[in-house]
Amino acid sequence: MADKLWVGGDGTGSQQTDWSRAANWSPSGVPVASDTVTFQSSSTYSVTAGLDQSSVSLGAMRIEAGYSGSIGTSSTPLECDPASLVVDTGDVGANLFFDFGAQTLDVTIKSCSFGSLGTYGVELSGAGVAISTLIVDSGKVGICTGVNETATVTTARVSGSAGELHLGTGVTLTNVDQSAGTIVVACSISDIDISGGVLTTDQAAAVTTSATVHGGTLNLDGSGTVASLVVHGGTVNFRGGVARTVTALTLNQGSISYDPASVTVTTWNVADRPVTVSATT
């Protein structure tokens, strides 16, 4: 177990950005199992070669403030299996692309870039990757947004106003905890707890257990069934004409906008306080 710092720049051409070149690391030597890998501002070199490191179970991977290089590409990401990933490049960082295979890890995005149109500052893919805790504070992050990419995420948390998280259809998502920022979800979710920011469900996304709204905005645009919706504040919108069902709805405070021609509410539960309900066209 050792600490490995990415330096880059050894040799010529693509050798300078090759993960597999020993002299691109300090101390010299390609990272092996359990090594901690760090990218710092002292290196401006990207990682564009030697990207298949899937056989190496790394320790922690840290992409620190000031590192402005890119890692992998959308079509050829860095394949690796770290125990954890922490990114804090700020908006100066280039795009970072990772394929974590079926690895189990925690992911913390303190800050990253917002990418160009249609891309993400950090894009994570895999085939059964298991993310226990996913935290996004700032920057644009995509999780398995491509075709045939799959992941399980136990808890996804966005707490920074500049955080933006997108989850693809191949994600199995248990808990969402949002107090700020933006989340767009194309997969089904077990539990949502939102107190700020904007969360939008898309495509066939369902809420299989409950959505609890304390504040912020919840746009339930997905066609899947919402098992339970409890509104203590904030705004809930059912946008578009897609048919969907809410099995149980409780409105204690806040507002709900929906069209009964497309949204079926099976049971309106009794609120826990006096409420005023108004309808507009």
Feature roles, as predicted:
Residues 1-281:
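Extracellular beta-sheet-rich ligand-binding/adhesion modules
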